[in-house]
């Protein structure tokens, strides 16, 4: 491939596309085109060749493609001195159009080329003020064109319809306007436009990158093409913050950071999500928000391969692997991996409950607790079990429920090895070993290991019996007692002994009965060493040592150590005889008396005298 090299002006390297040709380029090619053309223009601006005529060249080129080219960064105005002349950059004017271009590009709109014409008048004003009303070309004379940047293009033979091969060795005798008027427009057909663009622009891009970086920072050793970039880099190292907010006084090291910060005060949110319409004050926030719609999770944990939508979430997650807990509570010294967790924890010390239910006025320390509570009013149960279809208002409740299907019991007692499917059940069980009874009755100072037991106990003091039997009208303070009582009417005894087939109303009764077959007596008296198969029997026996008789007769004042003894004694005052013989109809006030009487009918004599062999009933 034959290459021809020539020293050209900005207009000579400008490429024009028709509207149809421009649409054929992908975004990456458009960006590359924009960056290189702007770089070429800036090289001319640095020598103040951005006269009105040259600016119109740039504008007409841009207008043909209906795109505005932006650097993406805002650079501070600087001055370059060549002899006695000062040349000011026009980056600020270019940046003023940057935001509008980004907005139109994001929304898919065509850029209005009338906006960029604002740049046209700026160069004329500068020429008048800095060159004593004389154009810079006249000031420099014949040396003017020696300052032109060497912009080389390599033309691919046979791929350009109307190539213009011009040398500007005699540029001093030809005016800029003449060069513009005599230069034919170069159009690129759709067949080879993309290939030519890549070849031309990439070559120029490489020249820019290969250019010597003459501005170096001694601290970091980093070099830059422009002194403005070096100045920005120095600000980062020095911690210099020269842009101050007029409202709150906060300072920033970049002007664009200050502009973003000001939106916090004004409430301006110029960036809008096309999916849901939500608006944001920063373009970065919009970018992160869009990932919620796309499901994109670009941040991946190297330890467990878990992915996240936000970099901050990945940073917090990494603390789990590292065990890092940088946030410490000043009250109790407890540490946390997240600052939000520390904030919530502090409310335990302050008692603050900032979240209030609008329905009932109840307050909560955590927002999640309020959300769960609110479902009690709405009846919402969004969490569903895939096994049985049961729904729950809390995700934790569903998680515990699933263990019923899987049989998982992850919580183990360190004392006896017993396992549980709920952490709360393990905590209650642990109190059996420690003897802890944190729930105290305010009426009688009695303590309990479970809150539910305390609630049941309180019903004794207030005499409340909310649960009523529909058969006989008898009331109970516990629903479990009502269920057991109902079995008396139905005759149902669902708990059956596998040894003898005897049935029981309650499971606890079956457990106690089973010890008669096994001979197990797990309850031992610490005073005399006597053992019992029931806990209630041990409690009754213990009163023999203490002399405690808590049950008192209201009629005669006699006291008893067992409730059953008081009930039996009370029948002497009332004359009640609830036990009736089915054979002869005789009634008795004690069950033991009925049992002895019943042997008269059966002839049973279970008691035998060992000395003489006499049997008695």
Swiss-Prot record:
Domain called KRAB: residue spans: 8-81
InterPro entries in the cross-refs: KRAB, KRAB_dom_sf, Znf_C2H2_sf, Znf_C2H2_type
Single GO molecular function: zinc ion binding
Subcellular location: Nucleus
Pfam families found in the cross-reference section: KRAB (PF01352), zf-C2H2 (PF00096), zf-C2H2_6 (PF13912)
Zinc finger (C2H2-type): 215-237, 243-265, 271-293, 299-321, 327-349, 355-377, 383-405, 411-433, 439-461, 467-489, 495-517, 523-545, 551-573, 579-601
UniProt keyword list: DNA-binding, Metal-binding, Nucleus, Repeat, Transcription, Transcription regulation, Zinc, Zinc-finger
Gene Ontology CC annotations of this record: nucleus
Protein task: May be involved in transcriptional regulation.
UniProt similarity note: Belongs to the krueppel C2H2-type zinc-finger protein family.
Name assigned to this protein: Zinc finger protein 813
Underlying gene: ZNF813
């Amino acid at each position: 491939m034959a290459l021809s090299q020539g020293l050209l002006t900005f207009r000579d390297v400008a490429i024009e596309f028709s509207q149809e040709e421009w649409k054929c380029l992908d975004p990456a090619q458009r960006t590359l085109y924009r960056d290189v053309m702007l770089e070429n223009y800036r090289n001319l601006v640095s020598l103040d060749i951005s006269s009105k005529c040259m600016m119109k060249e740039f504008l007409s080129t841009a207008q043909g493609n209906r795109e505005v080219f932006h650097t993406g960064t805002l650079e501070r105005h600087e001055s370059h001195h060549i002899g006695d002349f000062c040349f000011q950059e026009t980056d600020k004017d270019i940046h003023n159009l940057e935001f509008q271009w980004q907005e139109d590009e994001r929304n898919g709109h065509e850029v209005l080329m009338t906006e960029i014409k604002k740049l046209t008048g700026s160069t004329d004003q500068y020429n008048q003020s800095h060159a004593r009303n004389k154009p810079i070309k006249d000031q420099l004379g014949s040396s003017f064109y020696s300052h032109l940047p060497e912009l080389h293009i390599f033309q691919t033979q046979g791929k350009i319809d109307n190539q213009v091969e011009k040398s500007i060795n005699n540029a001093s005798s030809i005016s800029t306007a003449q060069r513009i008027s005599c230069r034919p427009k170069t159009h690129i057909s759709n067949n080879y436009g993309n290939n030519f663009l890549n070849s031309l622009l990439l070559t120029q891009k490489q020249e820019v990158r290969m250019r010597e970086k003459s501005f170096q920072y001694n601290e970091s050793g980093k070099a830059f093409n422009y002194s403005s970039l070096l100045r920005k880099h120095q600000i980062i190292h020095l911690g210099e913050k020269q842009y101050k907010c007029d409202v709150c006084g906060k300072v920033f090291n970049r002007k664009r950071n200050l502009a973003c910060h000001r939106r916090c005060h004004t409430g301006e949110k110029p960036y809008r999500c096309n999916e849901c319409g939500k608006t944001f004050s920063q373009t970065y926030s919009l970018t992160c928000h869009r990932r919620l719609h796309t499901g994109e999770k670009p941040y991946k944990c190297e330890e467990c391969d878990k992915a996240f939508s936000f970099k901050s979430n990945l940073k917090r997650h990494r603390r789990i692997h590292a065990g890092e807990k940088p946030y410490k509570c000043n009250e109790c010294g407890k540490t946390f991996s997240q600052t939000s967790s520390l904030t919530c924890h502090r409310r335990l010390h302050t008692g603050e409950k900032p979240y209030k239910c609008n329905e009932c006025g109840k307050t909560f320390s955590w927002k999640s607790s309020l959300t769960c509570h609110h479902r009690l009013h709405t009846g919402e149960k969004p969490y569903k079990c895939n096994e049985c279809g049961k729904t729950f208002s809390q995700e934790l409740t569903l998680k515990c429920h699933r263990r019923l299907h899987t049989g998982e019991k992850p919580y183990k007692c360190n004392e006896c090895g017993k396992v549980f499917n709920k952490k709360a059940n393990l905590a209650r069980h642990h109190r059996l070993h420690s003897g802890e009874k944190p729930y105290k009755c305010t009426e009688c100072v009695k303590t309990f290991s479970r809150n539910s037991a305390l609630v049941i106990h309180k019903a004794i003091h207030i005499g409340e019996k909310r649960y009523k039997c529909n058969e006989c009208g008898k009331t109970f303070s516990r629903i479990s007692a009502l269920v057991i009582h109902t079995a008396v009417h139905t005759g149902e005894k669902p708990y059956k002994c596998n040894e003898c087939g005897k049935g029981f109303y309650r499971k606890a009764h079956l457990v106690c009965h089973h010890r008669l077959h096994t001979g197990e007596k797990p309850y031992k008296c610490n005073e005399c060493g006597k053992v019992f198969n029931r806990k209630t029997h041990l409690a009754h026996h213990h009163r023999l040592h203490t002399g405690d008789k808590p049950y008192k007769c209201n009629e005669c004042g006699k006291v008893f150590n067992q409730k059953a003894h008081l009930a039996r004694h009370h029948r002497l005052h009332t004359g009640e005889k609830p036990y009736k013989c089915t054979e002869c109809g005789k009634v008795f006030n004690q069950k033991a008396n009925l049992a002895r009487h019943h042997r008269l009918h059966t002839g049973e004599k279970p008691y035998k005298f060992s000395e003489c062999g006499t049997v008695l009933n």
